[in-house]
Amino acid sequence: MKGSKFEDLSTDHSSVMTRDMNNAKRSFFALFVLMCAGLAANAQAFEGIIEFTKTTGPVVTNYKYYVKGDHVRIEEISARGDAQGIMLVDTRDKTVTALSPDRKLYMDVPNMRLPKDVKTDVKKTGEMRDMAGYKCEKWVVKSSEEDRTITYWVAADKFDFFIPLLETLNRKDEQAVFFLEVQDANGVFPMLGVEQKLDGAEVSKLQVTKVVKGVQKPTLFEIPAGYNKFERN
């Protein structure tokens, strides 16, 4: 029925359907782009294991960081090569849980300490050196009041977990405190940190020995089954 009201209604209905389909396609495409962008951002962030040593005087301690998103598992490695102390850190919720593998206990670690306020002079030298498979830049942080100079050799590889980790742990040692004084340090990790007095005497050294990228199991960052909570009396 050409020119009839039925034909007009049919044409209008088809136009509405076409417009709705186009809008739906645009909405789906926009959602797809956002999802891809989010996945790409997450894919770029470092996930894997970082092994390093801490030297203080004659004492050398081995550690491992297991990193996955907002979660970091810190293991202190014994001379036998197994984990003798473990901390589970959630940098989003700002919580720290300590695990005792020997005693099958876990404990919430409160952090009531105020951040340490120090006056420092920071110099990003631009000097480069290869370390642990990375090209690292030399940063020097100095404080006359604290009688300390710390030289960091930092690598940039989307180590986005590190600054939130330091803020969550809120440690008072100079290696951590001084690093937080550096502006625009997001995404880097110190492959070597040497703490010295102003007269040159070495106080401590943190040195990365191995970096392995790879997907980490979510269970690494959970309290294991069978662990009991340690209650303070």
Predicted segment positions?
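Bacterial N-terminal signal peptides that target proteins for export
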Residues: S4-E7, T18-F29
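Short hydrophobic targeting helices and cationic amphipathic motifs
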Residues: L9, H13-S14
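Bacterial N-terminal signal peptides
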Residues: A30-G38
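Extended soluble regions of mature proteins
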Residues: Q44-N233
